[in-house]
């Protein structure tokens, strides 16, 4: 096995299954030790563990403040798209009963490159008939923040500036993401 710490684990957030496995193998100095077939089997096994873990997810697992934020955005006729690197994103939304609150769910299988490339955010904006420059992107991972910036959208980070980067609006946790806060970020961005 490969032991990882919290700091390294942050680098795995927001990247595709294959990219995260590549990063893990590189970190554990096992890069290049597996054939393509073995790598695919490892990626599948990693995903199987993850799928087993998320079977128990319920609406009670929605992060604090997210349901009220999504509801407020819907009531204000703000379009909402999911730009997750995870192919399991739609399943998670279903388990948490959030799917009806989204106008679009960008499929990571439909993009050339995963985060930190901007492809998924460009696709998400397109699916709600907007340009990235007309969008805010909310992310809890550095790779996601980089992807939002590269797309031309305005990022909002959830977490710590030490992990996400300097010079962008950051809230410490999802409960601080309110419609009023996002309006302020947008107005400051446009300002």
Annotate the PLM regions.
Residues 62, 82, 137-138:
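Conserved SAM-binding loop
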Residues 1-68, 72-76:
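N-terminal helical cap/lid subdomain that shapes the substrate entry/recognition surface
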């Amino acid at each position: 096995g490969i032991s990882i710490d919290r700091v390294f684990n942050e680098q795995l957030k927001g990247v595709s299954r294959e990219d995260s496995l590549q990063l893990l193998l590189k970190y554990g100095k096992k890069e290049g030790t597996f054939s393509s077939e073995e790598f695919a089997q490892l990626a599948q096994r990693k995903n199987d563990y993850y799928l087993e873990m998320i079977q128990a997810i319920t609406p009670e697992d929605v992060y604090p403040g997210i349901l009220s934020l999504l509801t407020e955005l819907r009531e204000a006729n703000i379009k909402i798209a999911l730009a997750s690197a995870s192919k399991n994103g739609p399943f998670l939304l279903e388990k948490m009963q959030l799917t009806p609150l989204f106008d679009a769910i960008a499929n990571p299988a439909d993009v050339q490159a995963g985060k930190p490339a901007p492809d998924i955010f460009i696709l998400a904006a397109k699916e709600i008939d907007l340009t990235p420059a007309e969008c805010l992107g909310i992310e809890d991972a550095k790779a996601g923040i980089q992807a939002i910036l590269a797309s031309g959208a305005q990022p909002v980070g959830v977490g710590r500036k030490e992990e996400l980067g300097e010079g962008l609006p950051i809230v410490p946790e999802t409960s601080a993401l309110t419609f009023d806060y996002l309006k302020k970020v947008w107005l400051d961005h446009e300002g």
